Amino acid sequence: MKRRKAISSMAMGVGAFSAGSCSTKQKITQPVMEEKTMDKSFSSKKEKLKGNVNHSVCKWCYSKTPLEALAEACQEMGIQSIEILGEAEWTPLIKNHGLQCAIANGSPLGIRNGFNEPKNHEQLLKDNMDIIPKAAALGIPQVICFSGDRRGMDDMVGMDNCAKGLEPVVKLAEKHGINIIMELLNSKVNHKDYMCDHTEWGVELVNKVNSPNFKLLYDIYHMQIMEGDIIATIKKHHEYIGHYHTGGVPGRNEINDSQELYYPAIIQAVLDTGFTGFLAQEFIPTRANPLESLQEGIHICDV
């Protein structure tokens, strides 16, 4: 499943839960045999991690794995959070499994239709007025947002538009003690024409918004494609970053030695800045059993 489709579906509350099983839609439709097979293929011994990193994982990368099964696997692996979830998935995850949702999905308008377009502001505010109080009530610390595509718009005009549109949303976030984070994405490979595609642009937007409750989601995969200099950028701009995502380059697959980034050094650099937020695995597994890849990724990043 592609990221855009996954985010759109989750924002509308369509996830791993099927209808007709109470308000949380918790009934799993996948065969039990599939779940058992996955349980056998990764180490079922509960992980004892170093405790320096708050580990999370993006559900959309494991779209064929029921949320219930993924949550159980996360508990075994020592992962504290499953993120970018729609509202229907929050309560089952948090109440039934004691896990966190580090980032709630935002407006159903999605990645391409964001705050850089003034015509979207009314709907974005309406959506966030619904999402933010509910997320905060469950202790979810962050809600994601996007700049939107350029569609011929000048970057500075788009930045000003974003700042104006974000102002009432961020004020609401401040009131509820929750953060709004805008994701940095690459516009070369995955999200052609996306505006918030360089760290410096994002940093300037954060300065314009001027609130401790608005930060960037620094996606290491995306920014390696766009600008490189990952560790230097993290050291320079860490105060503007509220969350991190991983992914192998090229290909957005496993973060092992099949790709060009050395994640132990990157994660150590993140920790050296004093970062205490979440680091989420957002690579697309290539193994027959994706949970093996997830477990490997956690070990690589557990510095």
What is the role of each PLM region?
Residues 2-75, 140-141, 196-218, 222-303:
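Histidine-acidic metal/acid-base catalytic patches
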Residues 10-18, 45-49, 116-215, 225:
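Active-site acidic/histidine proton-transfer and metal-coordination neighborhood
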Residues 61-63, 86-88, 107-109, 149-151, ...:
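Active-site-proximal loop/turn and secondary-structure-junction residues that shape catalytic pockets
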Residues 70-90:
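Catalytic domains of carbohydrate-active enzymes, especially glycoside hydrolases
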Residues 90-104, 178:
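Short acidic, glycine/proline-enriched helix-loop-strand junctions
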